[in-house]
Amino acid sequence: MVVLDASIVNIALPKAASDLNISPDNYQWAVTAYLLTFGGFLLLGGRIADFVGRRKVFMFGLSGFAAASVLGGVAQNQGMLYGARALQGLFGALLAPAALSLISVTFTDSKERAKAFAVYGALSGVGASIGLILGGALTQYWGWRWCLFVNAPLAVVAVLLAIRNVTESKVSGDTRYDVPGAVTATVGMLAVVYGVSQASTYGWHAAKSWGFIAPGFVLLTLFIFIESKVTNPLFPLRLLTRIRSGAYASQLLSSTGLYGLFLFMTFYFQDVLGYSAVKAGLCFLPFSLGIIVSATVASHLLPKVGPRPIGTVGLSMAAIGLLLLSTLSVHVPYLTHVALPMLTMSLGLGQVFVASSSTALFNTPPHDTGAASALLNTTQQVGGSFGTAIQNTIFATALASYLASHHVMDKPMPALIGDAKVHGFDMAFRFGSLALAISAVLFFVMVNIDRHHLGQHDESANVFI
């Protein structure tokens, strides 16, 4: 539901902005409000799930996320929409780590756990891809508000299934909260994510950006120091083994490279080409099909070959696909210049979703599954925030440069602006492709486990910090 919402809202935003009179300067806040609370509270949410009870927190997160979605669906102004999106992020920060940690503690057999992680990763990929098509259809025929309302029935079904099938689990022993760690981590993450979002508007050198980013990193550094000293840390540094660190680092970089894709391609289809919301959603069909096929295949392969080859090949394919997409222009054949690159990329990403979710919780002690799950989601959100800001900066710079160098051309201004926008998209995609390529190398070098190790406990795993 969380990944579905992230992609479905991208398609709905242009219509929502028009209905609620949201200016271009404030457009990003519909996304930023969600990222702020989701990224800022994930680590705390993971620990709450461990201590209060993963099933209880999972169901509470589901219910709150659904209620916030309904609030956003009835929004009458931009402030109400932003508030609802912030609440969605807050409840999502409880829901996401609780869901992943429940898998880890529910499936104790190594092969069954590997299959469960594979299914979780596959569903994450499928949810994101289906959201693009569903968002277009809902926006076109029922209105953008239904892109938020749709979460309510999904949550009801999920809660009923959880009541019937999920047993409660929580840690025993010392469950005192690491208050200094919670404060420094949460405020630090909020500051970094907010500062990065400001950078996409005001630039990386602006005081409005670094005035938040720098203090945020100071607080996060202090958080690491605190975690090394306290007896019951919010995030136990013992979790940062070579293998899990590789999974987290590759997740951070791959999210940095990918998050701008959906935003830019949505504007390419709707703004540059003038497609309707439903047609724009259908243009993502090759991406959706590729995710479904590759995630399904990878979920069967994971217990047989392990995550290392699956993740490495997947990230490499995604990098190649995004590089091919950087040859985009206004007048190019859809099949060869859009559909084929998207298909290549998605055939890789489906594998990545499966491999990363299983590796991030590899050999995690039951006491720490919520914290480990939270860090995986945190790296994804922080990487996405950085990636979107960096790619927006690249896009804006490339657009301005293109207009400056082509303004003397005998070409109508609307057509010239369209060409300039696509040139900006291409430059942003090249950066994203590089980030994915580096992520593939990291995954290959650091995630050195095979199928035989998936269910074994490795006492010799090196801790990085």
Regions found by a protein language model. Give the residues of each.
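Residue-level recognition of transmembrane alpha-helices
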Residues: 31, 61-65, 85, 142, ...
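C-terminal membrane-cytosol helix-exit motif in multi-pass small-molecule transporters
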Residues: 152-170, 186-198, 215-230, 439-449
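Small-residue-rich transmembrane alpha-helices and their cytosolic helix-loop interfaces
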Residues: 31, 35, 115-129, 178, ...
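Transmembrane-helix bundle of Major Facilitator Superfamily
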Residues: 1-164, 298, 305, 326, ...
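Hydrophobic alpha-helix/TM-entry signal in multi-pass membrane transporters
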Residues: 58, 65, 81, 177, ...
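Flexible interhelical linker loops that connect adjacent transmembrane helices
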Residues: 159-186, 228-243, 303-304, 454-458
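Intrinsic disorder in cytosolic terminal tails and internal cytosolic loops
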Residues: 171, 411-418, 446-465
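12-transmembrane solute porter fold
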Residues: 1-4, 9-11, 24, 205-215, ...
